[in-house]
């Protein structure tokens, strides 16, 4: 009863029980849809310390959060990330600690992360062609990422999920091959419509947009898709494959089928801004609270609760429209 009475409820009666925490804005890739090629990263004093990140996680779990996802940038380039995972995973009441990674550091870190208590991994994979993969990531090594995926499987992670951002004319001819790759390794895969965050020069977003409906129609030419009621507590909607019971295909559709009505999420940027919506700038500065009142759990809890009235009902992303959010995805928490 005490947990219910302390639950985080926004102004539209949505229960907030999922926190996405960015632990760094830095990354060893420069993906074309995520950041500028010459990205300027934040100085260390501007980002939350590992202890500050833990304090926020601890307070959210005390307020009923049951799922935390660690993001970046690339979370595995943050020194001390394995220890942070261990501390957060041990919080009483937390059901799931997940991470989204580009996979490059998993050959050496998959086993330590699993041993520390990380529950699940999402791994970005936008192409199976080495040259194309390098073009999309600007610096990435496909073989290294595949080695990371295999290391995660050996470490014991279950329900590993691949994330693919679909860009028309750049990787949309690989949809079937990516699903077959997932089937071969008994992985889930989610296809994502590009998020319109930050001004990019690599491609015109309106021209590169590929809707989830189009992706699903193309896959249906090769596979039998069975709609599922399963949920990962996030925005993805899943289909089962008649041809492969161990693989689910998901779709995240911020443009064509937005998931705002049931949104249960907030995001913490590495600067300590609590973002109430991916597509809005409404935020609460938790870093200011953490540093002005170190160790004061009550003040931190009050700031979190006070922020909920800022959460809007929905975002207003438009395909091909003007960029409304200037922060890049790596600054938001991917």
UniProtKB/Swiss-Prot annotation:
Binding site for [4Fe-4S] cluster 1: 27, 31, 34
Ligand binding (S-adenosyl-L-methionine): 33, 73, 124, 195
Domain Radical SAM core span(s) in chain numbering: 11-236
This protein's UniProt keywords: 4Fe-4S, GTP-binding, Iron, Iron-sulfur, Lyase, Metal-binding, Molybdenum cofactor biosynthesis, Nucleotide-binding, S-adenosyl-L-methionine
Gene3D superfamilies named in the record: Aldolase class I
Residues reported in the UniProt entry to bind [4Fe-4S] cluster 2: 260, 263, 277
Note describing how the cofactor binds: Binds 2 [4Fe-4S] clusters. Binds 1 [4Fe-4S] cluster coordinated with 3 cysteines and an exchangeable S-adenosyl-L-methionine and 1 [4Fe-4S] cluster coordinated with 3 cysteines and the GTP-derived substrate.
EC number: 4.1.99.22
Required co-factors: [4Fe-4S] cluster
Keyword S-adenosyl-L-methionine applies: yes
The UniProt record lists the keyword Electron transport: no
Known catalytic reactions: GTP + AH2 + S-adenosyl-L-methionine = (8S)-3',8-cyclo-7,8-dihydroguanosine 5'-triphosphate + 5'-deoxyadenosine + L-methionine + A + H(+)
GO molecular function, one term: S-adenosyl-L-methionine binding
Description of how the protein assembles with itself and partners: Monomer and homodimer.
Purpose: Catalyzes the cyclization of GTP to (8S)-3',8-cyclo-7,8-dihydroguanosine 5'-triphosphate.
Similarity annotation: Belongs to the radical SAM superfamily. MoaA family.
Record-given protein name: GTP 3',8-cyclase
Organism of this sequence: Pseudomonas putida (strain W619)
Gene, per the UniProt record: moaA
């Amino acid at each position: 009863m005490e947990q219910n009475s302390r639950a985080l409820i926004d102004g539209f009666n949505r229960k907030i029980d999922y926190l996405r925490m960015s632990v760094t804005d830095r990354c060893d890739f420069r993906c074309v849809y995520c950041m500028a090629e010459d990205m300027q990263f934040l100085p260390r004093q501007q980002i939350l310390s590992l202890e500050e990140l833990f304090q926020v996680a601890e307070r959210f779990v005390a307020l009923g959060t049951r799922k935390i996802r660690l993001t970046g940038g690339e979370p595995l380039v943050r020194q001390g990330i394995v220890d942070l995972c261990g501390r957060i995973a041990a919080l009483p009441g937390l059901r799931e600690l997940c991470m989204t990674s580009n996979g490059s550091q998993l050959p050496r870190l998959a086993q330590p992360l699993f041993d520390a208590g990380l529950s699940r991994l999402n791994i970005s994979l936008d192409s199976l062609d080495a040259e194309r993969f390098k073009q999309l990531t600007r610096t990435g090594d496909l073989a290294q990422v595949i080695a990371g995926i295999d290391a995660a499987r050996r470490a014991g992670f279950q329900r590993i999920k691949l994330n693919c951002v679909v860009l028309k004319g750049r990787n949309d001819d690989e949809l079937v091959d990516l699903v077959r790759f997932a089937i071969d390794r008994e992985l889930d895969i989610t296809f994502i419509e590009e998020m319109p965050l930050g001004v990019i020069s690599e491609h015109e977003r309106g021209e590169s947009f590929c809707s989830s409906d189009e992706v699903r129609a193309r896959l249906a030419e090769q596979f039998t898709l069975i709609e599922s009621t399963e949920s990962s507590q996030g925005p993805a909607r899943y289909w089962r494959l008649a041809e492969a019971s161990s693989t689910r295909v998901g779709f995240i559709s911020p443009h064509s089928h937005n998931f705002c009505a049931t949104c249960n999420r907030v995001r913490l940027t590495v600067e300590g801004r609590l973002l109430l919506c991916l597509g809005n700038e409404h935020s609460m500065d938790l870093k200011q609270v953490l540093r002005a009142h170190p160790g004061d759990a009550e003040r931190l809890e009050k700031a979190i609760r006070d922020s909920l009235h800022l959460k809007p009902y929905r975002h207003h992303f438009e395909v091909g429209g003007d960029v409304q959010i200037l922060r890049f995805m790596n600054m938001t928490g991917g």
